[in-house]
Amino acid sequence: MQIAILSFFHYFTLMFKKRESVFEVEEGKFLSPKFDKDGLIPVTTSDSGSGELLMHGYMNEEALKKTIETKEAHYWSRSRKDIWHKGKTSGFVQKVIDLRIDDDQDALWMSVDIGNGASCHVGYKSCFYLSLIHISEPTRPGH
């Protein structure tokens, strides 16, 4: 499982590089994340086994570096204004299996192993446990 993470480390330079060109961002071998005006980058997290969407959060530069270094998920808590090592208190640590950055380097997708744990602070596996629309059968146009 660590092969995917190690290939990420070997492919990208761990030091964040200033964004110099579109080509360098999209095709280069340097990690040049684009943080927003608040210094954050969005991260979508899914279960490495099932692919289930677990949560959406944010990382600042320090959280991203800690995640890469420890191979455990660290987020930026916007409410507490602090680094949040996911599972440090609850015991439901998210072990990083794969961490990807999109072509513009302005969004992250992280695949994690949570064992039999939860990702949601209220105890559910996924923070997306509230369904707004659920279509059980495909609908056909005109029917």
For the regions a language model picked out, list residue spans one by one.
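Short, positively charged and aromatic/hydrophobic N-terminal segments
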Residues: 5, 11-13
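Short, basic/aromatic recognition patches
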Residues: 16-38
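Single conserved hydrophobic/aromatic residue that forms the stacking wall/gate
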Residues: 133-143
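Short beta-strand segments
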Residues: 31-60
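A short, polar/charged loop-to-alpha-helix boundary motif
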Residues: 61-76
